[in-house]
């Protein structure tokens, strides 16, 4: 079924409205949906300034293919099955084929939470997606999608997890929750947009070909219409660039260097002490100015072979070279 449409919307380029602002239009040139549920839409945007066609087209294409949220089956549990390389009695397809068929289901959900669907089918006959038991806010878009073929008396019973996400998610074997309850995980394709093409044409304004016209083609899996996909992509881009309108141009203030901390890391060799005083401090495991500042003058006198003359030498060196002083005695109540 093909529906030809021509819907035009006017937009204004520019941060403020004025008579010099450039108006452009978005037109849905064509829209149709095939028997497989693939929805196609063709849009024309223009006139744009020269060079903006590629900029807008490339940005929209990337967002459409990778940033739109979709719904997919993430794991399946089949009664009597412990691994994907087994078979189900009376079912033509092996477990791997059933998992691949479940992977190709097209679903639409309004809930951000992981949900559980079920299937109980008895042969003989073909099992299609319309026989799935789904939560109330989950809809199957391709109800005629084939899942399995059952022989006389065969029973296929399964549960499957339904989740939302972006892009493509490979099997995560570290997901202990799913592994612990015997679910077989499958690679999930959340992308509602299957394909995007764009082309930039010259647009005539007056007598001159001085503008761009962007032609955008979008194919979706049917869970979104191309119009909805384009609208969502535009909102994502607006949200991405909006914070740039409030950029602060104030230069960041560099942090002040911690001069005291730098001094504290200086080795005691910089004090240029006498050999006697230096050796006594080293034997007491005093290696830096930071270590030395933990002592009082009285504490220094308690170091073996460290006399009053050596203590005065240390105090004078600290004062002369770094402007630091040692207290004479330790305050009461402090260790």
From Swiss-Prot:
The keyword Transcription applies. Pfam families: RNA_pol_A_bac, RNA_pol_A_CTD, RNA_pol_L. Signal peptide: none annotated. The keyword Transmembrane does not apply. GO terms for molecular function: DNA binding; DNA-directed RNA polymerase activity; protein dimerization activity. InterPro entries: DNA-dir_RNA_pol_insert, DNA-dir_RNA_pol_RpoA/D/Rpb3, DNA-dir_RpoA, RBP11-like, RNAP_asu_C, RNApol_insert_sf. One of its GO terms (biological process) is DNA-templated transcription. Residues 1-248 are annotated as: Alpha N-terminal domain (alpha-NTD). Its EC number is 2.7.7.6. Residues 256-335 are annotated as: Alpha C-terminal domain (alpha-CTD). DNA-dependent RNA polymerase catalyzes the transcription of DNA into RNA using the four ribonucleoside triphosphates as substrates. Belongs to the RNA polymerase alpha chain family. The N-terminal domain is essential for RNAP assembly and basal transcription, whereas the C-terminal domain is involved in interaction with transcriptional regulators and with upstream promoter elements. In cyanobacteria the RNAP catalytic core is composed of 2 alpha, 1 beta, 1 beta', 1 gamma and 1 omega subunit. When a sigma factor is associated with the core the holoenzyme is formed, which can initiate transcription. This is DNA-directed RNA polymerase subunit alpha. It comes from Synechococcus sp. (strain JA-2-3B'a(2-13)) (Cyanobacteria bacterium Yellowstone B-Prime).
